[in-house]
């Protein structure tokens, strides 16, 4: 088998994997959209944290659809030796790569701006839905229990919420004593203020920074695969008659 044919086979196998990953993400996205609480129970607090900031179901459906189409395009281009399909595959992957780099730069440089924007979106929802909307409340409870945090910024996010109006106290997670691994009761305004439990957004950022090597390694690996796929597709394109 010549070098060209070997690379062609590798291109097909690689894109079959992308195709299958896209199909899996589509399936999970549909599942999350239909039954979010079950998703949280299985995948734990990090998944519930993500659900506070983006609509995970729609995000996974969109990402799955892109990967599904990209995998099909790569397989088709390599198998049929279509220069048009290979060039389209290359440019789509290039756009995705540029978007990922831009998103990473924005996330690093404008973390405070992102926090302010998310605060304006998430906090009003907490005040409106927590304690009255079952799925929303369950997702937040899973987040706070898993990350040992309280609200998006702190306990004041729950002021005026259906939960506080009904119970006269804040969620117990806002009065968590990390030293004794217990909840202080009753979790009223005075206790919650004195406990000063970290907000979930800052706690999530802390966890990400703590695992920066792992996060960076995964990001570098994905970027490397994308660059390799672009190089291979361009190699095939240039060697086709």
Swiss-Prot record:
Q: What are the annotated disulfide bridges?
A: none
UniProt keyword terms in alphabetical order? Glycoprotein, Lysosome, Membrane, Transmembrane, Transmembrane helix
Bilayer topology reads: Multi-pass membrane protein
Which Pfam family, just one, is annotated for this protein?
Answer: Tetraspanin
Q: Which InterPro entries match?
A: Tetraspanin/Peripherin, Tetraspanin_animals, Tetraspanin_CS, Tetraspanin_EC2_sf
The record's comment on protein family reads: Belongs to the tetraspanin (TM4SF) family.
The main location class comes to: membrane
The reply on keyword Glycoprotein is yes
Q: Name one GO cellular component term.
A: vesicle
Segments crossing the lipid bilayer: 12-32, 53-73, 89-109, 212-232
On whether Plastid is a keyword of this UniProt record, the answer is: no
* GO BP annotations, alphabetical order: protein stabilization
Q: What is this protein called?
A: Tetraspanin-1
Residues glycosylated per entry: 141, 154, 167, 180, 189, 194
Subunit (UniProt): Interacts with SLC19A2. Interacts with NTRK1/TRKA.
Give the Cytoplasmic compartment stretches of this protein: 1-11, 74-88, 233-241
- What exactly does this protein do? Structural component of specialized membrane microdomains known as tetraspanin-enriched microdomains (TERMs), which act as platforms for receptor clustering and signaling. Participates thereby in diverse biological functions such as cell signal transduction, adhesion, migration and protein trafficking. Regulates neuronal differentiation in response to NGF by facilitating NGF-mediated activation of NTRK1/TRKA receptor tyrosine kinase and subsequent downstream signaling pathways. Plays a role in the inhibition of TNFalpha-induced apoptosis.
Alphabetical list of PANTHER family matching this protein: TETRASPANIN, TETRASPANIN-1
Give the Extracellular compartment stretches of this protein: 33-52, 110-211
């Amino acid at each position: 088998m010549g070098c060209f044919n070997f690379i062609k086979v590798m291109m097909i196998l690689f894109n079959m994997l992308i195709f299958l990953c896209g199909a899996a993400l589509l399936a999970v996205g549909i599942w999350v959209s239909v039954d979010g609480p079950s998703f949280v129970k299985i995948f734990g607090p990090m998944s519930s944290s993500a659900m506070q900031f983006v609509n995970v179901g729609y995000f996974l459906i969109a990402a799955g659809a892109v990967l599904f189409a990209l995998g099909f395009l790569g397989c088709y281009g390599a198998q049929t030796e279509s220069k048009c399909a290979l060039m389209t595959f290359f440019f789509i992957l290039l756009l995705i790569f540029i978007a990922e780099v831009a998103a990473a730069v924005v996330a690093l440089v404008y973390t405070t701006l992102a926090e302010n924007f998310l605060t304006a979106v998430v906090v009003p929802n907490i005040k409106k839905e927590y304690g009255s909307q079952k799925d929303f409340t369950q997702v937040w409870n899973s987040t706070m229990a898993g990350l040992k945090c309280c609200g998006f910024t702190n306990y004041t996010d729950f002021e005026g919420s259906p939960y506080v109006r009904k119970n006269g106290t804040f969620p117990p997670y806002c009065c968590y004593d990390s030293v004794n691994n217990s909840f202080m009761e009753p979790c009223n305004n005075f206790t919650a203020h004195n406990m000063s439990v970290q907000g979930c957004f800052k706690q999530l950022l802390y966890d990400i920074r703590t695992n920066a090597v792992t996060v960076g390694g995964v990001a570098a690996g994905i970027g490397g695969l994308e660059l390799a796929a672009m190089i291979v597709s361009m190699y095939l394109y240039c060697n086709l008659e």
